């Protein structure tokens, strides 16, 4: 037997201070661990209720699908009268250069919205409004109310709309960028994630209506009745997110200034670059490359002179030998394996 300094009694499970544990998990935002470690005692439930993921909220939606010019006129009137509206596009591709517009969704009030199908194509598909009809009514209304427009990732929607005759050269807000400004360290700012995080709402997923992997179909092939609920929800949730995020930004003037003066103007710049590319002066680029090469060569010569010998600057092993063994520089930090870092 080997004495390892541990006895059997010390390995017994002790009582957990669930309230302290829940408090710690809440502070550190360890939601999965909170669920795994919770004993679900009444006290534990109360202490960690903010960490428990509730059943997703279901809205009493009032969505409509527009097939008539009268419907377009009614919604054009709504855009004129509202303070802010959400807009979203549905396409048959994620490539803004080649994607075709399949439909437009709008929302002027929470728990309501409309979908305007334009490019659905499947057997038995009902007659849709033409692009020209939509532009004549809704397109013009969108343009004259553009400064009320809110979207989620408008860098995608703006070029899609532009290629189909609707110019959105100004807008009110982008919820994806609002989320980024509020929480720049978050890894995801997509609508589905934001809806769950800020609204506790589980959205309809694209895979739910169009399939996944090899069985996935184009949005243009999705039946309009099914597509409409998905698309209108996108606009509705975007409007809800805007209202929530706008409230969170009310006491953050610096972030709002950054949004309006940098992030929002940059949307148009990046959109144009993606559509048109960027011009590069080949001669200037070669000249700059030559300057950098000369500078690198000069710095390399200096490094050899200081070390007293030539070595491979790209080799971490040789760098360690030169810096810490030959030049005796102090080791300020080490790697987990004990090597100078």
Predicted regions and their residues:
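Amphipathic alpha-helical transducer elements in NTP-driven molecular machines
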Residues: 132-135, 175, 188-192, 232-235
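Acidic beta-strand-to-loop metal/phosphate-binding motif
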Residues: 86, 146-154
């Amino acid at each position: 037997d080997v004495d390892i300094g541990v006895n059997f009694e010390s390995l017994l499970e002790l009582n957990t201070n669930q309230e302290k544990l829940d408090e710690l998990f809440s502070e550190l935002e360890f939601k999965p661990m909170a669920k795994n470690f919770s004993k679900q005692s009444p006290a534990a439930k109360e202490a960690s209720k903010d960490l428990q993921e509730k059943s997703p909220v279901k809205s009493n939606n009032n969505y409509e699908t527009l097939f008539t010019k009268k419907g377009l006129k009614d919604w054009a009137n709504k855009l004129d009268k509202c303070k802010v509206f959400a807009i979203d596009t549905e396409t048959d591709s994620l490539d803004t250069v080649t994607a075709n517009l399949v439909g437009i969704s709008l929302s002027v009030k929470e728990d309501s919205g409309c979908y305007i199908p334009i490019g659905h194509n499947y057997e038995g598909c009902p007659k849709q409004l033409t692009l020209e009809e939509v532009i004549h009514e809704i397109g013009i209304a969108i343009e004259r109310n553009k400064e009320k427009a809110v979207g989620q990732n408008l860098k995608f929607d703006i070029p899609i709309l532009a290629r189909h005759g609707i110019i959105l050269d100004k807008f009110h807000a982008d919820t994806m960028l609002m989320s980024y400004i509020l929480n720049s360290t978050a890894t995801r700012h997509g609508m589905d994630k934001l809806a769950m995080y800020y609204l506790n709402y589980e959205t309809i997923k694209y895979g739910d209506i169009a399939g996944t992997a090899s069985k996935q179909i184009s949005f243009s092939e999705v039946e309009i009745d099914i597509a409409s609920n998905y698309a209108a929800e996108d606009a509705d949730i975007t409007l809800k997110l805007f209202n929530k995020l706008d409230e969170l930004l009310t006491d953050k003037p610096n972030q709002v200034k950054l949004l309006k003066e940098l992030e929002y103007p940059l949307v148009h710049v990046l959109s144009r670059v993606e559509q048109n590319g960027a011009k590069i002066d080949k001669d200037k680029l070669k000249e700059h490359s030559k300057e950098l090469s000369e500078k690198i060569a000069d710095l390399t010569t200096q490094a050899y002179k200081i070390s007293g010998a030539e070595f491979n600057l790209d080799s971490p092993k040789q760098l360690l030998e030169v810096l810490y063994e030959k030049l005796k520089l102090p080791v300020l930090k080490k790697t987990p394996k004990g090597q100078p870092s």
